[in-house]
């Protein structure tokens, strides 16, 4: 094989390996972010959950004090991922999650479906939520 062809082949191989590593890292961080978010929601840590929301989403859809106070009335009793899909070459993910919430003031449990849209932020090297916190006023 000609030395130039050999160098080009090695370069192409190196680029493919680096792209694969990058993709695997994004996949791994997606799983970690989803697990962290699920844990925070299961413990009804609504303020911590808000830290997962993308700043640009918050600018357009700020969380009101009323929204946070309403969420604080509820304790999560169940969090079940019903479907998940990845788009845009692994940079966007959507999850449909069934969340059961118990309101101690009313002694009532309700079930909501939370449609989550996540996008990988390459600058921050983390997954951010682009769909807001669960809405306890939605009925299943």
Predicted regions mapped to residue ranges:
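Short solvent-exposed beta->alpha transition segments
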Residues: 31, 46-93, 107
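Sec/Tat-exported extracytoplasmic proteins
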Residues: 38-45, 53-57, 61, 101-103, ...
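Sec-dependent bacterial lipoprotein signal peptides
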Residues: 1-21
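Exposed beta-sheet edge and beta->alpha loop/turn motif
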Residues: 88-140
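Short, structurally constrained coil/turn elements
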Residues: 15-17, 70-75, 123
């Amino acid at each position: 094989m000609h030395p130039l062809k050999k160098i080009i082949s090695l370069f192409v191989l190196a680029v493919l390996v680096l792209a694969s590593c990058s993709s695997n890292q994004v996949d791994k961080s997606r799983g970690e972010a989803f697990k962290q978010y699920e844990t925070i929601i299961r413990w009804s840590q609504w303020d911590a959950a808000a830290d997962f929301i993308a700043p640009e989403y918050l600018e357009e859809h700020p969380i009101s004090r009323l929204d946070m106070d309403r969420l604080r009335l509820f304790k999560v009793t169940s969090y079940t991922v019903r479907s998940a899909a990845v788009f845009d070459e692994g940079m966007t993910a959507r999850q449909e999650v069934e969340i059961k919430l118990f309101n101690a003031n009313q002694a009532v449990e309700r079930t909501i479906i939370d449609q989550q849209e996540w996008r990988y932020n390459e600058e921050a090297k983390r997954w951010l939520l682009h769909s807001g916190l669960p809405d306890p006023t939605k009925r299943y």
